[in-house]
Amino acid sequence: MIYAIASLCDWFGAKHVAMRLFAAAPRSDYAAWWGAVGLMQSGKDEEALGLLMRVRAVHPEWKRTKRLLATLYLRRDPEKAVQLYSPPMGIWEEVFLGDLLYFFLHRENEGVQWWRKAYERMDWKSARELDNPARLLLKRLCRVTSDPVLLERFAELDTDNFRQQDIVNYVGILASRGEMDKAREMLDRGFYLYRGDPMLTACWERLGFGQVPPYKVKTSGTAAIRHNVYTGLLTEASDLSSIVDRVHQEHPTGVVTIASSVMSMCEGTLMWVGTFKPSRLARFLGPYTGHGGGKFIHWYSYPMEAAWKVQAYIELAGTFRVLLGAGATVLGKLLHRKGWFYAVVGPVAKAVDSDKVMPYDACLVPGPLDVETSIAILARKGARISVVDVNDVFGAEIVTSTEGVDEDWLRRSLEDNPAGNDDSMTPIVVVMPE
């Protein structure tokens, strides 16, 4: 009965109620995962750990709960996370095991060996589909080996995790072969996505291509002083509170802005590809979402990736609201209005995106589920905090802030995306009045 009520609440989008009930009746991988997430949201990590260990003992084949259990192990004893995936069952678990060894236990050689094993079993016919880890393995192996053959194959996939450093490395190969037109085209594409990026600009100037492509670069609308905080690779095991406390001590008058994706990662709500599948409804609605539109067509414009995002919308907002949003979209098109779908499904679902930083390029990242509670904990020592969603193309959006933050001023101060992009590893920016 509890499970049935939880499922009904989930269908209508009463997510927090559903999570509490799923924790009491974890009868499926989905229910157990969301139940554990709900416990973690409430600060009950020990209860979440107990729930995940119990379902793991009965249902070792459940993939979502297994990866969430690994998250909790990483925060306590990373070696247990490795043991959880030893031996790995299938290609995705080989990727996960390699990531755990390489990024968390710093046993780089062992991690690379597992990536190579997974690479040898790759199905290249479906390499552009989201649930094929080809793009992830190529990115990892290119970074650690600098193999030009692998890098060229990675570039040919035309994937959205081919980022600034990858572009610069590939352009170097093209230039060394005298293929300057292709090198220029690749950099041009990079500038479309990362406008004004210093890494790409330096490469462009070094090759003597003249004026940088004139894609409109957003500028800050204030005279605020911005200080980028280099954090290195933040992980689900990072202590964000101590980082915020240190930054606040160094800049007591500034507003500490944190990327919303970082908040979601710390909440544990990452949706790992390879652990779940899109539903029939998600596959049906996916091709109509228009994901991936733009000047350049990348693999993520394929309906397959869109279906995964719609599945995330369904899980976060509920089937009812997604159907209602789809109806609102049809009505909006008749009335020549845009944005009605996201107005219905809400900001948490709207924020869903695929991460590009290893090892989180294997995830869909929703908006923070309980951002008000999260920033209240981070601000316990007096820091003024804003959670933001900023990129080069669309500018800045303020998700929420602690009391006393002028959000309009802050939004204008961040319009030019001073944090940069993935390879910059500066997801925290302190903004101070002039």
Regions found by a protein language model. Name each.
Residues 2-20, 24, 28-43, 174:
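Alpha-helical segment of the N-proximal tetratricopeptide repeat
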Residues 3, 30-34, 62-64, 92-96, ...:
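Start-of-helix register in tetratricopeptide repeats
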Residues 4, 34, 68, 96, ...:
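"A position-specific structural signal for the A-helix of alpha-solenoid helical repeats
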Residues 12, 42, 75-76, 104-105, ...:
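Structural motif corresponding to the intra-repeat A-B loop/turn of tetratricopeptide repeats
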Residues 16-24, 46-55, 78-88, 108-121, ...:
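Alpha-helical repeat scaffolds
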Residues 26, 60, 89, 123, ...:
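Short coil turns that delineate tetratricopeptide repeat
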Residues 33, 37-40, 67, 71-74, ...:
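Alpha-helical adaptor scaffolds
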Residues 205-434:
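N-terminal and secondary-structure boundary signal
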